[in-house]
Amino acid sequence: LLLWAWTMAGKSVIQLKRPDLEGYFDFVHNPPTPWIGTSVQDRFKIIGGESRQNELWRPFAGKIAKENRKQAIVEGTDIEVLRDGHTLSHEAMKICYSAVSCYYDYLTDEGYAFGNPIPAIRKQSPYLIKGATQKNIKRLSDLQWDYVLECAQSAADADPLHERTLFVTATLKSLYLRVSELSDRSNWQPTWKHYWRDSDGNHWLKVLGKGNKMRDVSVPSALLPFIERYRLYRASLSPSFGINSALVAKNRGTGGMTSRQLRRIVQDAFDLAYEKMRSEGFDGEASALREATTHWLRHTGASQDIATRPLKHMADDLGHASMGTTDQVYIQSDMKERARSGKTREV
C-alpha cells in the first residue's frame, strides 16, 4: 500500500480517500507485469554485512504452473512472459482487505487518520464473492500413483541410492504427511525414535505439524515393508545407525533433509513415472502428472482412504483441528447430498 500510494497515487496513505483505495484494490487484483516476479524473493539481502536491495524482488509473485515453467526452459523461452494476466485469488484478496483494514485501525488509534474506510469498501467489493463452492482436490489419479510407486520401486531395485526416493514417496502418501513434517527444522528433527510401536503392536510416527502441534500418525501394515527396507539400507551404510539417526538422511553429509531437498526427491519419482507413462501411451495422464507437487501425495492418500475410515480417525491422522475441516476438504458431504437430491428434478 505504501509503495502504491507513493509511486502511483503520489500521496501519503493518510491522504487517501475512498476512491483512491478502491483504485488500489483494483490495482492489486490485476497488477501490471513489471510489479510481478516469477518467484518469491527477499526484499533485501545481506551483502558484505550490509542490507542491500534485492533487484529480483517484486511486490507480487506470479504462480507459474510447473508444466509451463518446464516448457519455457525446454524451449528457451523467457519465463517472464508467463506473468501476463496474473490476478490475485479470492483468498488473497480477502487477506489484502484484512491487512489494510488492520493498518487503518492502527493509523486511527494513533491519531494519524480520522477513520477506517476499508469495511465500507469491502462490503461493496466486486472481488469478494460470498458463497460456497466445491473445491477440487489436487491429487494423483489411481493410475498416476501406481506408476509413481512402481517407478520408485524399480529405481530402488536398480540403484540403492533410490531407496530414499521410495521411502519418502511411500511415506508421504500413506501417512498423509505435509513435506515439512518429514523435514529437518530448527525446532524439530525427525529421527527413528519417533517411529514407534505400542503395547498392542500398532505402529505410529510422531510428527510436529502446523502450529507446532504434536501428533501420532497411525502407520498402516502395508507401509511396514517399505520402512523396514529403508531401515536395513540405512543400517548397512553406517554401524552408528540407531534410533537417534535422522529419519531421512542426506546421502552426503550428516543430519536430516530440508523441505526443498525432499521435494526434489519426490520430483525424481514423478519424472520417472512421467517418462514411463508417455512411453506406454498415457500421454494425457503423463501431461497432468507434470503439474503434480509433493503436497498432492497427502491429498492422494487421504482421498483414497476417506471412504473406508472413520472421519474422526482421518482428521486425527491428517492433523486437522476438527472433523468439519476434513469433511469440507475431502468429503464435501453437503455438496454431494445436494447433488444427489437435485438429480431427480424435472425439466
Task: Locate each region found by the language model.
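Short, basic (Lys/Arg/His-rich) helix/loop patches that form interaction surfaces
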Residues: R263-D316, M323
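Conserved tyrosine-mediated DNA breakage-rejoining catalytic core shared by Y-recombinases
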Residues: D184-R229, A235
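DNA breakage-rejoining catalytic core of tyrosine-based enzymes
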Residues: L128-E150, N212-A222, S238-I243
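Basic, Lys/Arg- and aromatic-enriched nucleic-acid-binding interface segment
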Residues: T87-H90, Y147-V179
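Short pre-functional
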Residues: S101-D105, E163-D184, L205, Q304
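DNA/chromatin major-groove-contacting recognition/catalytic segments
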Residues: D316, Q328-V347
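C-terminal catalytic core of Y-nucleophile DNA break-rejoin enzymes
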Residues: G209-R229, I243-A269
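N-terminal core-binding DNA-recognition domain of tyrosine recombinases/integrases
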Residues: L1-K135, A155-A156
